[in-house]
Amino acid sequence: MGDPKKSRKKWESPGHPWIKERIGYEQELLGKYGLRNKREIWIAQSIIRKFRHQARSLLALPPAERAVREKQLVGKLLKMGLLKRETATVDDILSLTEQDLLERRLQTIVYKKGLANTTYQARQLIIHGHIAVNGKRVTSPGYIVNVDEENLIDYYVTSSFKSRPPVMAQQEGGEAGVKQA
């Protein structure tokens, strides 16, 4: 029996920490997708960077091998939901952004399906075990949902939200977050 595998970082932080435009853009993404910290953005950027690197390396291959590997990569990205059409090319892969990947996170899809009122509530429901994918509890908001699984997202069987979904908070007298009885 060997030693356990060394865990490595899944992300790479920006080279220069204080670029105003990048900081503003990242703050916008944090709010839009309900992310906990900028590391989640950097993880998405690293994943997209890896796919783009694979696509660029395809361009150097001989045409026969390139066609096979391109079909495999496009198939994987179609299954993940990052590409929309089967006739996608290397150019489509090179034009992917981190927003495309953030749209495929479980947290975002739970919010867009209407199972939660906000992206932050979606994150809380997932972490507390109220959300299931294909009947199995998933507690990771960063779970990348495949296209096949997208329609199988629902409340977990024993969740209290199954019978009574979250009610949209009503504003009364300017107070946010007060629920009406």
Swiss-Prot record:
Protein name: Small ribosomal subunit protein uS4
Superkingdom of the organism of origin: Archaea
Assembly information from the UniProt record: Part of the 30S ribosomal subunit. Contacts protein S5. The interaction surface between S4 and S5 is involved in control of translational fidelity.
Function: One of the primary rRNA binding proteins, it binds directly to 16S rRNA where it nucleates assembly of the body of the 30S subunit.
GO CC terms: small ribosomal subunit
Any one biological process term the GO annotation gives: ribosomal small subunit biogenesis
Family matches, as Gene3D superfamilies: RNA-binding S4 domain
Keywords: Ribonucleoprotein, Ribosomal protein, RNA-binding, rRNA-binding
Keyword Ribonucleoprotein found: yes
Similarity remark: Belongs to the universal ribosomal protein uS4 family.
Species this chain originates from: Saccharolobus islandicus (strain L.S.2.15 / Lassen #1)
InterPro entries documented for this protein: Ribosomal_uS4 (IPR022801), Ribosomal_uS4_arc (IPR022802), Ribosomal_uS4_CS (IPR018079), Ribosomal_uS4_euk/arc (IPR005710), Ribosomal_uS4_N (IPR001912), S4_RNA-bd (IPR002942), S4_RNA-bd_sf (IPR036986)
Molecular function per GO: rRNA binding; structural constituent of ribosome
Sequence ranges assigned to domain S4 RNA-binding in this UniProt record: 104-166
A Pfam family hit: S4
